[in-house]
Regions:
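A late C-terminal transmembrane helix in Major Facilitator Superfamily
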Residues: 68-96
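Paired small-residue
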Residues: 25, 36-44
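Multi-pass alpha-helical transporter architecture, strongest
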Residues: 108-127
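Structural signature of the two symmetry-related core transmembrane helices
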Residues: 13-27, 108
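Helix-to-loop junctions at the C-terminal end of transmembrane segments
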Residues: 1-11, 95
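Helix-breaking motifs and short loop linkers at transmembrane-helix boundaries and internal kinks
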Residues: 10, 31-33
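Intracellular juxtamembrane helix-capping segments at the cytosolic ends
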Residues: 51-64
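A membrane-interface helix-boundary motif in multi-pass transporters
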Residues: 93-111
């Protein structure tokens, strides 16, 4: 489904939609930590992650020559999953040292970086 959305609307719009879904996740988690909000946040997190991961991965292979695509995607997957594993393993420590609200605020920093890099790529593409 995400691939069809990318073909219809383009990589950037799906990435912005993914950031928006992540922002809903952060806001839902930030203000109340009850089970319902947690469940809603997980649903938006799943869709946001899917939109960002699929659009980013499909955009990555477009920037390489045909004979480099598989190596680039393999290296990208290694980096993404290594960072994901590190974040998962360190989340408990980070939560113990800070708070749930702080963790959500840190997510906003990464969302802003994604928006800025996507905007930059859009501006370069238009030139």
């Amino acid at each position: 489904i995400t691939g069809n959305l990318i073909r219809k609307f383009g990589h950037s719009k799906i990435m912005y939609a993914g950031v928006f879904l992540f922002l809903i996740t952060v806001l839902t988690s930030f203000f109340d930590q009850n089970f319902t909000n947690y469940l809603i946040a997980l649903i938006f997190l799943g869709f946001g992650w899917n939109f960002l991961f699929i659009s980013g991965t499909s955009l990555l292979v477009l920037s390489y020559r045909e004979n480099e695509k598989f190596k680039a995607q393999g290296f990208n997957d290694l980096i993404v999953y290594s960072i994901q594993a590190t974040a998962s393993l360190s989340a408990g420590v980070f939560l113990t040292l800070t708070s749930w609200k702080t963790m959500n605020l840190v997510c906003i920093i990464f969302l802003v970086l994604i928006i800025l890099s996507t905007l930059r790529a859009d501006l370069k593409e238009r030139k």
